[in-house]
């Protein structure tokens, strides 16, 4: 990736486009870690002093490294608080990110390294107070630092406490990733993948461990393998302060921070009100501590400068030393250096000989490389480039160059060149480069970083594996959730489809019934008209027959009367005519009455039969309505039964899917735990082999070094023998002179012979004692070395055995906890499935009861309506005078 070019346009605004190598000059390494290196630098544009953190994102895990850089930059951009490091920008150059921040003097762990003793309680309280304020700010914005330790708590010149290194931070709370530094990790972080999530309370635990670190120089379990420390933290009780010199307030604060259960652990705001950080303390406590540390660092660096300058001058005068000379001078120099450091340590509490020796060895190596080049200019440049203001310049050979104006050599052949003098003047005038970290400490960090690369890779690989396992679990959970959502959506669509189909079927049934009713009504109307027409036609026929019968009867009666009158000759014709007319009128009247009566009977018959026909039609319509409602209710019942069968089938399929998904999730979790445990075991075995190799290498070096040590001790015994011989020789001379003076001259020869024999005998005894001392020393040293090495081997075996047992116990606990978690998940699922099935069955029962109730009510309402309709019809018939209509027998069948 070229400078300033970001492939992702969403992240382009995170980085500055300028070339960082042109902007930031005078880079000096001031720290080293797994991410890379931190440099002191000057902004050439603003002349501002900054710290530059270089992070490479090339090589293995390139994408993961790039994402970590993106996350840290985004996190830093959001921070605006006096107790968090100030972010100034980020640049890209040759697959390296330059993260620019404000410059701080050093970290709280540097104080411990420089003074080689714990901090005072008031100093710990001041540092803790500042760190707590930064944590309270983070936690109030749902952020988690996740890597609180003394090395990530920085100090500025005015004594301001700053939280730094947000590479492990999280912008979401709760979180569940396995990140942080092992010895400071909270138990819930170690168990994050196995048991669930954590929140900002993990920073409180790390702060408690940091307090112990500041009070005891190292965090708890620091003498243990980092992996073993993880297992120990996860299953053992919380650590406490070991010494009784601390106040109850401090002890209570630490115990409060290190509550095993997160819910019992206090929040950062609550801790800010604790007496330990709230009580009164001197305002300049941190400023004074920083000043003392700077003075101690300056003294140590000056001592290192004088030591290296002496070596350079000796080599420039005497040339290369042979091996024996180097050994002797190394021994003498080590003795004198130890005396110097002991004296200096009692006054200034600065690092012990071990630290300076490490720096010495690295510096000597680099100087020897310079000497082998044969360039006097390079030698002069090195000897005159030590910075009096504790500035650090990191070369590729790990030499930290200092400029010391007070150590100019008057000899012209050893003075630096003009260019070197100007460079020294440049560093001498740059007084702003103040630090509380010595050059030897930075050198040691670099060497430790190189030497512990295998262990660091193992730990980073373990963290990466845990994070990868977490990602796999989350991916599977998301996949299963999507599958379940899809399944539920499918079931929901099936239910909706069934409901729509049922509604359509009922609507079709309703339409069909409506059409049938309409058709029946039309048929009934047609039948009624046909029935009426039949009655009318019959009545017309009857009326015609009746009229014809009347006509015949009229004629018969008329003829009969005429015959009777014709037989009666006595009656006058006129009277006969009157009688015939009167009889004709009476007959016509009678026939008219009979016709009217017939018409009345026909009309009554017509109306009554029409009424009866309407009643029959109404009863038939009622039967059709009953049939329709029976059909509709049966249809609804069938649909509801089909719906219930579908719901039960869906519940069964959901149950099978849930059990299958839980089985898949638990199987993956167990597979990952087995893989994790296998990796942990392999790491432990690899660590055991490495420790055994290191111990074997150490013993081999001791065996190789033993002849040299024995030679030194033999020389000491030889010197003692020589001194004794000299004393005896002096005593012999004194005794000889005395006896010669007090004895006659004739006895001198005898006395001299006697004294000579005595001297020879005593020297022979001394020689025998010398040989015996040498042999005893040889035997005792060999035996002592064998016993010491055997004791070391035994101690290492015991330690490794304890760590292996601790690992086995931890893995057994994790396995048991996981199995218990799986059992709880299975029980929870069974309860959920059982409860859901019970709710479904209850719902089905309630719906069936509601359906039966609806059926009964609708049939009841139908019968009541039909009865009212018939009753109304019959009442109307009664009012119309049809009281003798045939009563319709209603069906007694109850469809309920």
Curated annotation (Swiss-Prot):
Residue ranges constituting the Protein kinase domain according to the UniProt record: 24-277
Domain of life, source organism: Eukaryota
Residues annotated to bind ATP: 30-38, 53
Catalytic activity: L-seryl-[protein] + ATP = O-phospho-L-seryl-[protein] + ADP + H(+); L-threonyl-[protein] + ATP = O-phospho-L-threonyl-[protein] + ADP + H(+)
Polar residues: bias regions: 334-348
Membrane topology: Peripheral membrane protein
GO molecular function, one term: protein serine kinase activity
GO biological process: DNA damage response; DNA repair; mitotic G2 DNA damage checkpoint signaling; positive regulation of JNK cascade; positive regulation of stress-activated MAPK cascade; regulation of cytoskeleton organization
Keyword Nucleotide-binding: yes
Annotated stretches, region: Disordered: 316-366, 403-423, 565-593
Keywords attached to this entry: ATP-binding, Cell membrane, Coiled coil, Cytoplasm, DNA damage, DNA repair, Kinase, Lipid droplet, Membrane, Nucleotide-binding, Serine/threonine-protein kinase, Transferase
One GO CC term on file: cytoplasm
One Pfam family, short name: Pkinase
Cited function: Serine/threonine-protein kinase that acts as a regulator of the p38/MAPK14 stress-activated MAPK cascade and of the MAPK8/JNK cascade. In response to DNA damage, involved in the G2/M transition DNA damage checkpoint by activating the p38/MAPK14 stress-activated MAPK cascade, probably by mediating phosphorylation of upstream MAP kinase kinases. Inhibits basal activity of the MAPK8/JNK cascade.
Family of this protein: Belongs to the protein kinase superfamily. STE Ser/Thr protein kinase family. STE20 subfamily.
Name of the protein this chain belongs to: Serine/threonine-protein kinase TAO3
Originating species: Xenopus laevis
């Amino acid at each position: 990736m070229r400078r300033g070019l970001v492939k992702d346009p969403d992240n382009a605004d995170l980085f500055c486009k300028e070339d960082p190598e042109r902007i930031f000059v005078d880079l000096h390494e001031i720290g080293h870690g797994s991410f890379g290196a931190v440099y002191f630098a000057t902004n050439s544009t603003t002349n501002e002093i900054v710290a530059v953190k270089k992070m490479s994102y090339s090589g293995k895990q390139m994408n993961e490294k790039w994402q970590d850089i993106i996350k840290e930059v985004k996190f830093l951009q959001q921070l605006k608080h006096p107790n968090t490091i100030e972010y100034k920008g980020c640049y890209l150059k040759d697959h390296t990110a330059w993260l620019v921040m404000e410059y701080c003097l050093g970290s709280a762990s540097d104080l411990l390294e420089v003074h080689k003793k714990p901090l005072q309680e008031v100093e710990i309280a001041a540092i803790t107070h500042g760190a707590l304020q930064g944590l309270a700010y983070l936690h109030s914005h749902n952020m988690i630092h996740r890597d609180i330790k003394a090395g990530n708590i920085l100090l500025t010149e005015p004594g301001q406490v700053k939280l730094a290194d947000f590479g492990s931070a999280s912008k979401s709370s709760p979180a569940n990733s396995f990140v942080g530094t092992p010895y400071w990790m909270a138990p819930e972080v170690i168990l994050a993948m196995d048991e669930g999530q954590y929140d900002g309370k993990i920073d409180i635990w790390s702060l408690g461990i940091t307090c112990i670190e500041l009070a005891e120089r190292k965090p708890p379990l620091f003498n243990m393998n980092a992996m073993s420390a993880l297992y120990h933290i996860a299953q053992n009780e919380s650590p406490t302060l070991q010494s009784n010199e601390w106040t109850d307030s401090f002890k209570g604060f630490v115990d409060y921070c290190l509550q095993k259960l997160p819910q019992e652990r206090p929040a950062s705001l609550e801790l800010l009100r604790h007496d330990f950080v709230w009580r009164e303390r001197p305002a300049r406590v941190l400023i004074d501590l920083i000043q003392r540390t700077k003075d101690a660092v300056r003294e140590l660096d000056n001592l290192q400068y004088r030591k290296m300058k002496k070596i350079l001058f000796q080599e420039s005068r005497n040339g290369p030393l042979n091996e024996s000379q180097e050994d002797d001078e190394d021994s003498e120099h080590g003795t004198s250096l130890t005396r110097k450091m002991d004296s200096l340590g009692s006054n200034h509490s600065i690092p012990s000989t071990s630290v300076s020796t490490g720096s010495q060895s690295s510096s000597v190596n680099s100087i020897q490389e310079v000497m082998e080049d044969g360039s006097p200019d390079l030698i002069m440049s090195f000897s005159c480039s030590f910075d009096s203001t504790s500035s650090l310049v990191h070369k590729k050979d790990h030499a930290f160059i200092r400029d010391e104006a007070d150590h100019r050599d008057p000899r012209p052949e050893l003075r630096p060149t003009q260019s070197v003098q100007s460079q020294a003047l440049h560093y001498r005038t740059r007084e702003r480069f103040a630090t509380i970290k010595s050059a030897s400490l930075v050198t040691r960090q670099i060497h430790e970083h190189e030497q512990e690369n295998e262990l660091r890779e193992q730990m980073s690989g373990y963290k990466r594996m845990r994070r990868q396992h977490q990602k796999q679990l989350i991916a599977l959970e998301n996949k299963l959730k999507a599958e379940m959502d899809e399944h539920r959506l499918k079931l929901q669509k099936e239910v909706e489809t069934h409901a729509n189909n049922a509604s359509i079927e009922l609507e079709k049934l309703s339409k069909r019934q409506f059409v049938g009713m309409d058709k029946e009504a039309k048929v009934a109307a047609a039948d009624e008209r046909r029935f009426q027409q039949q009655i009318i036609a019959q009545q017309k026929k009857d009326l015609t027959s009746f009229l014809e019968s009347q006509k015949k009867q009229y004629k018969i009666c008329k003829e009969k009367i005429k015959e009777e009158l014709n037989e009666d000759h006595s009656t006058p014709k006129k009277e006969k005519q009157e009688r015939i007319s009167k009889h004709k009128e009476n007959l016509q009247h009678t026939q008219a009455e009979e016709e009217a009566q017939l018409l009345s009977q026909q009309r009554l018959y017509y109306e009554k039969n029409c009424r009866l026909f309407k009643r029959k039609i109404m009863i038939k319509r009622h039967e059709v309505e009953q049939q329709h409602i029976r059909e509709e209710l049966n249809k609804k019942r069938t649909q509801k039964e089909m719906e219930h069968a579908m719901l039960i089938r869906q519940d069964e399929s959901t149950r099978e899917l849930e059990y299958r998904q839980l089985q898949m999730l638990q199987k993956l979790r167990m597979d990952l735990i087995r893989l994790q445990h296998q990796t942990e075991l392999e790491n432990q075995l690899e660590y055991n082999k490495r420790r055994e190799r290191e111990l074997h290498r150490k013993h081999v070096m001791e065996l190789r070094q033993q002849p040299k040590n024995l030679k030194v001790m033999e020389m000491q015994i030889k010197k003692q023998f020589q001194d004794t011989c000299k004393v005896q020789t002096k005593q012999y001379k004194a005794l000889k002179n005395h006896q010669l003076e007090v004895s006659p001259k004739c006895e001198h020869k005898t006395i001299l012979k006697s004294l000579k024999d005595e001297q020879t005998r005593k020297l022979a005894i001394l020689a025998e004692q010398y040989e015996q001392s040498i042999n005893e020393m040889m035997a005792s040293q060999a035996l002592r070395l064998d016993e010491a090495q055997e004791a070391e081997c035994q101690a290492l075996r015991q330690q490794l055995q304890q760590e292996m047992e601790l690992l086995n116990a931890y893995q057994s606990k994790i396995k048991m906890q996981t199995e218990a978690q799986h059992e709880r998940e299975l029980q929870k699922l069974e309860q959920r499935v059982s409860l859901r099935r019970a709710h479904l069955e209850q719902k089905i029962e309630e719906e069936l009861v509601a359906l039966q109730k609806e059926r009964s009510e609708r049939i009841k309402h139908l019968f009541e309506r039909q009865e009212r309709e018939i009753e109304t019809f019959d009442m109307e018939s009664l009012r119309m005078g049809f009281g003798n209509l045939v009563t319709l027998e209603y069906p007694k069948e109850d469809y309920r």
